[in-house]
Amino acid sequence: MSQSFDFRGKTALVTGASSGIGRAFAYALAERGARLLLVARSRDKLRDLAAELRRDHACDADFLTVDLSAADAVDTIDRHLKETGTFVDVLINNAGFAAYGRFETIPLTRQRDEVLVNCVAALELTHLLLPGMQARSGGAVINVASTAAFQPDPYMAVYGATKAFLLSFSEAVWAENRHRGIRVVALCPGATQTAFFDVVGAKEAAVGVPMPVANVVRDALWALDRNLSYRVVGARNRLLANLQRLLSRQMSARLVEKILRPREDPDFAATDLKA
């Protein structure tokens, strides 16, 4: 039986920290005694969040404004860590977004950015920070994937592929490090109470009843305490994820296409959905 992960005195880097699941992670880790480095694009939101955490939890909270789709994003973070003498013990790769629409209608630049933010940033940050965790014989990485990782996702084709990457990547890195004191979890939430589906509408996209972000984060930390390699959030979502194993890939894709298809003409304009 694994011991609960102790965040006291540890430094956690949280990407996409300005809102939604990332913000909820920041509060949860502050409550558990972690120091925080908050990363996102919105300086004002990060500044306000850091101030709230210091006020409410007497937390050591720093922030760094970075666009993770930029070529030098991880270099910028690395430089900040070296300049401040910061050693990261916990990495929360939460930043991400989805471009919603028929694949060919979505600008290629947006889909490339989707891969950069959802996949490449997580890969590069893990590659940057994992050796330090190994040297200190302890640490944790939580990669925020999605239930979209378990099947093809028409109208969010690239998004689903990026989340499948995160799931497979996380499980592999977990296996490589399971005896080295490092825990790696792929967190797979379904619909969540964030702005993610505001444009589409939960009813239109048939994504189910959104779950509070606090519940998602609580499930993530529960999985981390048990050294699980992945965690699907919610009993209904776990059932649906397992049902995919009983269907052919073609059948799964056809069913999800019907669920995610918009009511209007299928040649609808593409829309970005922020995580």
Where do the model's predicted regions map?
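C-terminal helical subdomain
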Residues: 186, 204-241
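Conserved glycine-rich cofactor-binding loop
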Residues: 11, 18-19
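Active-site helix of classical SDR
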Residues: 126, 162
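Conserved NAD(P)H cofactor-binding loop of Rossmann-fold oxidoreductase domains
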Residues: 94-99
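Residue(s) in the substrate-gating loop at a strand-loop-helix junction
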Residues: 146
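Substrate-binding pocket helix/loop in short-chain dehydrogenase/reductase
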Residues: 102-115
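Conserved glycine-rich Rossmann-like NAD(P)H-binding loop of the short-chain dehydrogenase/reductase
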Residues: 34-49
